[in-house]
Structures are given as structure tokens and as C-alpha cells.
């Protein structure tokens, strides 16, 4: 991915495809599944069959392979790019979540960045 001149990311991104369930708040009946394109300690970029408005609060449930529990994180939609009627890129900034999920995400990112020889990032803001 090319960055615009002067653009800097706050967190290292890990490109990995994981299943993610997204529930818009407060519309729990509108839950849908998508998959990640990449994620970091600050947020996630996912491919979705549906679109969401910018600013929409969401609950994300990230399914991590070889892990006994899912990661539950809260966020808000920052950017949406429609690729087709049924494929949308949605960028979500993390705004919180349960402490265990935040810690588990940080550990998962540290493992993956260590394998790539990248310095780990700061923890998710509470």
C-alpha cells in the first residue's frame, strides 16, 4: 500500500485474514461477518458484505485461530470504500473493549511483529 507523502501511521499493521463479526450499536440485529485485511493495536481494516456510515459505533468479535476465546473490541467506523455492491472496505478505530481482549490482541501483535522483526506497538487505549 502506498502512503501519501507526510502520512505516518501510529501503529504497525499486520496483514492477516481472520474472520470478524461486526455488530453496529445499538442495532444488534444487523450483525454481519467479514474478514480482516489488516489490523493493528489501533484498529482494523475489514472486507464486509454490507456498508456502515462513518462514525458508526460497532462491537467487533475477532476469531483468532488456535485460541480458545474470541477477542471482543469496541470501535467506530473511520472510513468506508465500496468495491462493489457486496464488497466494502471498512476501517474501524478501536475505542475500547474488555481488558482481556485488549491484552490478547497486544500479545498476538507482538508475536506476529516479532516474527517479522518489527518493534511492537503501544497498547490499545482504554
Describe each region flagged by the PLM.
Residues 18-61, 91-93:
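Short strand-loop-strand
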Residues 14, 28, 54-56, 69, ...:
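Residue-level preference for beta-strand/loop junctions
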Residues 62-65, 80:
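Short beta-turn/strand-loop junction motif enriched in small, turn-promoting residues
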Residues 25, 41, 80-86:
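Short, conserved beta-turn/loop elements at beta-strand boundaries and strand-helix junctions
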Residues 65-73:
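Short, Lys/Arg- and Gly-enriched loop/turn segments at beta-strand edges
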Residues 1-39, 106, 110-126:
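N-terminal helix initiation/capping motif
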